[in-house]
């Protein structure tokens, strides 16, 4: 029994869900998301509640059931509240700037790195060393934040680099002299 798949998704006020042959469109105050799901999972909308049902209890169906429910719930949360990831930069001279929708990063290279914001993603800079990536799609927000982090991931000796806020970076000792 998939415990996640059996949970009911409650639609918040202002969120509409349309299911057209397992192509689900979710509209809300922050925007609209569309995704195609497996035809094996039946999606039922009853008022403000959405339930998912699977045809049998095979292992494959259970995994698809739980995954579909989680993806659908992320769509509902995204169009109603949105998602955001915060990154912090540590290092001498490491800073970020916004040029329109482009994020320009100075992270100790001979040239600045430029990151174009994908569709539906916004960058905010509360200060020059903090980056906030926000949008309605959890998947795209996470991928964009991971890409920004990959431009200079934290190194274990001095801890310099771009990291998620609250991320623990394990530190190593340097070489011991003679």
UniProtKB/Swiss-Prot annotation:
BP GO annotations: cytoplasmic translation
GO terms under cellular component: cytosolic large ribosomal subunit
InterPro entries listed in its UniProt record: Ribosomal_uL6-like (IPR000702), Ribosomal_uL6-like_a/b-dom_sf (IPR036789), Ribosomal_uL6_a/b-dom (IPR020040), Ribosomal_uL6_bac-type (IPR019906), Ribosomal_uL6_CS (IPR002358)
GO terms, molecular function: rRNA binding; structural constituent of ribosome
Organism annotation: Streptococcus pneumoniae serotype 2 (strain D39 / NCTC 7466)
Family of the protein in this entry: Belongs to the universal ribosomal protein uL6 family.
The keyword Cytoplasm belongs to this UniProt entry's keyword annotation: no
Biological role: This protein binds to the 23S rRNA, and is important in its secondary structure. It is located near the subunit interface in the base of the L7/L12 stalk, and near the tRNA binding site of the peptidyltransferase center.
Pfam families, per the entry: Ribosomal_L6
Subunit relationships: Part of the 50S ribosomal subunit.
Keywords, ordered alphabetically: Ribonucleoprotein, Ribosomal protein, RNA-binding, rRNA-binding
The protein's name in its UniProt record: Large ribosomal subunit protein uL6
